[in-house]
Amino acid sequence: MTPGNDSQGRQAVAGALVAMASTAVLGLLCVGSSVLAADGDAPLFGQPPAGMPNFTGKWLNPKPAGHLRTTNGSEPPLNAAGKAEYAKRQAALKSGDHKVDPVSSCLLHGVPRLLYTPLPFLILQTSRDVNFVHEANHTFRNIYWDKLPGDEPDPSYLGASVAHLDGKTLVIDSADFNDLTWLDYSGLPHGEKLTVQERYTLIDPATIQGSVTITDPDFYTAPWTTRLTLKRQPGMALAENVCMDTQRM
């Protein structure tokens, strides 16, 4: 090959590589834009069918609760075992012994406690599932529509959850919890028979009105319900949140 032809060949190869790179970048941009819009709050890939409420976005509980109460403001209906366990935890906390709180050892917050932290979280809703991505300890909940995808799960910190719609309300039913988490920061207990129902309704584009119903015959005399409000946080980024197990340092 002559020097002139060699130069032309190199230019042709370079041009081809640039074209390939441009195509790849464009493809990535298209995929990225199809998952989330510029503010990160509008999914276009696998988005819910027309007419289905879309809860995708970043949300924050503006009134995080240290101690959960029922919808009428009363104390949860603890039974004798529940009162004894709660009193023991309260005494430890008041004495300054915070290592009794599972979160102090970097265990997961559990449900519904995750919903009452002062940290934001992302809801990503698709035609297949609903995903909650929490800033708190980078906790992730993958919730399928209507039924679980596999065998009966083992007990876990977050339980096993399925979602369905009740009109315009998103309903999430969870069970199969272990007993290693607290329901709130004050130490409300639960056992492995715990079931949790979350209900979320978009009352306007920036507000979710929610409720959480707790059923646990091991520690409560009856099911009870508490409420929460979530506010949309467009443009807010989820920060890195690394748990440091100070009890072992």
Q: Can you annotate each of these PLM segments?
A:
Residues 2-9, 15-17, 22, 26-249:
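Hydrophobic small-molecule pocket/channel-lining residues, especially in calycin-type beta-barrels
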